[in-house]
Amino acid sequence: MGPRAAQSLAEVSALPTSLRAVLDYYATTGEFAFDVVRLQRRVDAYVEEVIDEAFAPVEQAIAEEAGVDPDAVSFAYDTKLTMPAELTLGHLYQRASVGSPAGFDPVDRSRRRSPLERVPIVGSATKPDEAAYERAREQVAAVERAEAVTELVVVALLDGDMRDAMNDAEYDDFRVEGAPGVDRPRTAEIAQRVLRERVEELFEGYPDAVRGAYREAVDRSEAHQDRDPYFRELMADAREGDADALAAIRDEYKHGSFVGPDPDSDGDLDDVAPVADPVIRPAELFVGDEPAFPYLKTQYGRVGVIYDGMIEMYRAAGIEIEDAFKRSIVFTIIGAQIWLDDIDDYADDLAEVQLTPVTAEYLLADTEREAYRNVVDATTRYLDAAERYAAETNSPLAGIGTNYVFRRGDPSVLPGHAD
């Protein structure tokens, strides 16, 4: 099958979205990513194992609360926030595979068993290739290190997401079976407490800088969340025709700057105590015309900063990751937030007076058609940039992930889709 045929198949809506994303990647690059698909399956399996292990003590604690057999309890939590960690692990898997001797796969091993048991003897029967053997050892160690940090990152992301959900009294994503008398709010309390303890245990195995990167990202994220009432007030006033509120939405929410005077900012991000030696520097991260992307500052504070901090956790643990890959992750998650969540939730956000890039555009634009086009154009800029950076860093899995986000979205639900 050639690239043109792959492109045609990628447009067939009856096919699974994940397959269409792979086909579109092949059509665009000419590279049919069999190895990448295999790595994705390994990433999925590893992260699923991490989550299962993290939730096992949650189920134990819920069972104790309910006074039932732990084997009868099933706990689940619905979140998409682990996707950037999965893409990062896939990127590190890919790097280790490329750096390994021919014929050796550093990822293909049992997670808990010593991977060196499966390192082949490279070279002739009488004279092994010691250099190749050492390269294999190094890449196996790199995979182990990447997986260990990813475990910390995934559990920390789950812990933080649960904490945010509880603060907002949103319990729909917490699901438990087999524990009569334990309602969702109580389930959430138990789950978050257990995960918080697990996160602290995992942090003990790393330098303080890893915890510092995580804490810095959380503080900045919470500082942005603290501005939510202000943005809600702007939206309410703008809907009443307040010209000053509309101007503030345009200047602060849509076109806010990471540098320069801003009455509601410390000059870099939203109100947050200065950090002596910050590792999160958005004013230095984005290059070229990227600082002018619509809604970049506010959406970076809303969702992007957590994943900037995630990459810094890997770095603080001794794993090198390129700035270009970090941009790919941040742009993907911002694009996904708008393209998947904000578009789908437009009607609810409008009713709840929740300012998002989507509700903002329908206030700022002169017509619904213009607002629709602005939403699509803004999201496309983020996802296109993410895809370019994925290619630049030889991370096809991230490129396919970005394509997957685009194909999952349905902007036709918005007003102004068709005149």
Give, region by region, the residue ranges found by the protein language model.
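Aspartate-rich (DDxxD/NDxxD/DxxxD) Mg2+/diphosphate-binding motifs
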Residues: 110, 116-117, 121-143, 147-149, ...
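Primarily interfacial, aromatic-capped hydrophobic alpha-helices that serve as membrane anchors
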Residues: 194-233, 305, 365-408
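Divalent-cation-assisted or electrostatically stabilized phosphate/pyrophosphate-binding catalytic cores
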Residues: 175-204, 287-301, 327, 350-391
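N-terminal, motif-rich segments that launch catalysis or mediate targeting to/interaction with membranes
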Residues: 34-88, 192-264, 270
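Intrinsically disordered, low-structural-confidence terminal and linker regions
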Residues: 1-21
